[in-house]
Amino acid sequence: MLYIVATPIGNLKDITLRAVEVLRTVDLIACEDTRHTKILLDHYGITTPTTSYFQHNRFTKGEYLLKLLTQGKSIALVSDAGTPGILDPGYHIINLAVKNNIEITFIPGPTAFVNALVLSGKPSHEFLFAGFLPNRKLARRNQLKRLSELKYTVVFY
């Protein structure tokens, strides 16, 4: 079983009881940065083994994690903050699990763009999450111009 576990954004207390329980009971926690995740795990006295799973090892580590999942191991996927699979390499292992009929359970929690949307005070019945803006000035300016012409609320990082 693959558990997609949302983790706190900034405040370690912003985690669900269910997330703590899952992190304590799985066989392995796959995290973007084991050093960062260790802070959360230490705070809650969680001693589950961890392994790194990040942008540059997602293909090889993804195959390794898939092998463990097919052997019946339970793995929790966490990102450094927020919900795995949103603008991080988590989508890759989730996709592998879906393609290989691995059972997936989502443990909800913080997602930065939802917080931004709600706190904006803008209408939320129709919105676009545009992800990260381009780094280059001209591309960023062009993207902002395009987004400003939309008729609904836009959230981006």
Where are these regions (language model features)?
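Loop/turn-to-beta-strand initiation segments
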Residues: 1-2, 72-76, 152-153
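Glycine-rich, flexible N-terminal cofactor/catalytic loop recognition
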Residues: 1-55
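Beta-strand/loop-alpha-helix module characteristic of Rossmann-like adenine-cofactor folds
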Residues: 5, 114-157
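Short active-site oxyanion
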Residues: 23-29, 102-104, 153-154
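Conserved helicase motor
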Residues: 51-60, 132-137
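Short phosphate-binding loop-to-helix
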Residues: 55-70, 89
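Short glycine-cluster motifs
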Residues: 71-130
